[in-house]
Amino acid sequence: MGRMSMYALCGFVCDILSYHFHVFYDIIEARDEKGGGRMFRRILAVGDVHGEADCLERLWAKIAFDDAHDLLVFLGDYIDRGPAPVRTLQFVQRQTEKYRNVHALMGNHEAMMLSYIDAYGMGHTIMGQFDLWLANGGKITRKQLAALPTAEAKALTEFVRQRPISFRTSHEDEEILFVHAGVNPAAEDRGEDMLWIREEFFKGYYGDTVVVVGHTPTQRLRRDCAPVPLFLPNNIVACDTGSYLPDGRISCVDVARYLRLRRSGHRLSSEERASCCVQAVPRNG
């Protein structure tokens, strides 16, 4: 079975069984309180990383983040599948601790990891109710976490546990909601939906709030789509460009620039859309 076919199968199974993974959310939503409500030059969102730490570090260098003028939100799914999930988590943690205007959300893979750890700890490879995490790329994360000193692994796990599942800010009176997967138009603020939802969100959301998401690779949303972020007409910005897929990228989207451009009222050109994005390619991509 090819990589894309295996991805589709795992994604399908993962979606069906997602509600087996219950995380007690300590923080449902974070707001732009650190920034004091001021206007940011750039409002940035980084899509799914999935253990591609080297690629993320190259992307970070391209972004040239400025804490005095920028806001940046990591959209979750730092772990699993790629070669360096623990180093990816550590990198994200360092940025949130170093910069007041960098925020990191929880993704569904982090939620699966926490459910597994809460059920079994890190010392054993259990194949049972929670083996879906291991089957969806969690084995390398479990192995690397288990290799850390106990105190270090516990601290990193606690960092993950404290991630909010959404973040809100605004730009020139337009509300912006950052979540990993999306929102359910029929059920407001359900944590599971914010981590897991796919089709119902993309087909059913028509709200006034701009919703910025990862989770679903843009290559999966449109069959002919290149690995680039999508700016959809129903106020959705899709940032996951399939970091671990054969043609994948890690993408950073400047949401503020996109909103400024679309206020002109004309249909954005491909060049204008591209000007809202920075990307890095995994070495094996």
Regions found by a protein language model. Give the residues of each.
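Short N-terminal helix/helix-N-cap motif within the alpha/beta-hydrolase-1
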Residues: 54, 82-87, 114, 187-188, ...
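Methionine residue identity
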Residues: 1-6
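Active-site neighborhood of divalent metal-dependent phosphoester bond hydrolases
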Residues: 81-167
